[in-house]
């Protein structure tokens, strides 16, 4: 259960497929019955890769992401983490300081079980995952009737609801005047829920939800449902 601490993140309770979840404004899901945090598309190392190629991008994204995960662990008292693919970005070698940072963080949370459902960017990085003492599995991973995947289209047994990543979903919301603001979102239909990308330097993909989809936008440290006219406008936009 959430701990009452200063700066506690707000959350939106959500039920689907007979399970209760909490959608969090840091783009993760807390699963109380499993004491688990679900997150997708961290893409650790992407900014460092760009900097190595001479592209000026901000430093410190790894620190920011690790702190967000740590805060969520402390606030939810979770005992396990499930990464829904693309834990790291595709690059052939790691800088020492980058690996050291991840290993130091992992050491601080040795009591947390960490499982990675392999994504397309995780191929060839098993040495790092072994160092991080992560359980690495192919999709889908079935946990209490939920199929944990990287790709939303992954085939699962009939009747299994999927939670997935890969898409980096976002929606455009009208701001002041004619301006549009692109913000990340969770999106659910009858068979799959897709998480927004957790990474600080990942980009997003604008979706066009169906009227029957449930869309939950993430902005200003809040998670809020887009329903009614707002949902229809998104579908038509």
What residue ranges belong to the model's regions?
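Extended recognition/assembly regions associated with phosphoester-bond processing machinery
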Residues: 1-84, 89-237
């Amino acid at each position: 259960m959430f701990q009452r601490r200063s700066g506690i993140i707000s959350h939106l309770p959500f039920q689907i497929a007979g399970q209760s979840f909490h959608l969090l404004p840091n783009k993760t899901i807390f699963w109380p019955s499993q004491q688990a945090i679900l997150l997708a598309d961290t893409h650790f190392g992407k900014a460092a890769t760009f900097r190595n190629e001479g592209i000026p991008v901000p430093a410190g994204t790894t620190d920011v992401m690790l702190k967000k995960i740590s805060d969520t662990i402390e606030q939810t008292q979770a005992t396990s983490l499930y990464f829904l693919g693309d834990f790291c970005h595709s690059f052939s070698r790691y800088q020492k300081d980058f690996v050291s940072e991840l290993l130091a963080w992992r050491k601080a949370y040795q009591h947390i079980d960490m499982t990675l459902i392999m994504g397309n960017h995780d191929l060839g990085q098993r040495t790092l995952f072994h160092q991080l003492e992560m359980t690495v599995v192919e999709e889908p991973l079935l946990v209490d009737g939920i199929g944990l995947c990287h790709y939303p289209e992954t085939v699962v047994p009939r009747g299994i609801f999927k939670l997935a990543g890969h898409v980096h979903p976002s929606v455009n919301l009208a701001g002041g005047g004619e301006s549009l603001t692109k913000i990340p979102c969770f999106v659910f239909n009858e068979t799959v829920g897709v998480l927004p990308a957790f990474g600080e330097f990942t980009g997003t993909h604008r979706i066009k939800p169906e009227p029957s989809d449930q869309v939950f936008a993430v902005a200003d440290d809040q998670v809020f449902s887009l329903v009614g006219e707002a949902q229809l406008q998104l579908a038509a936009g």
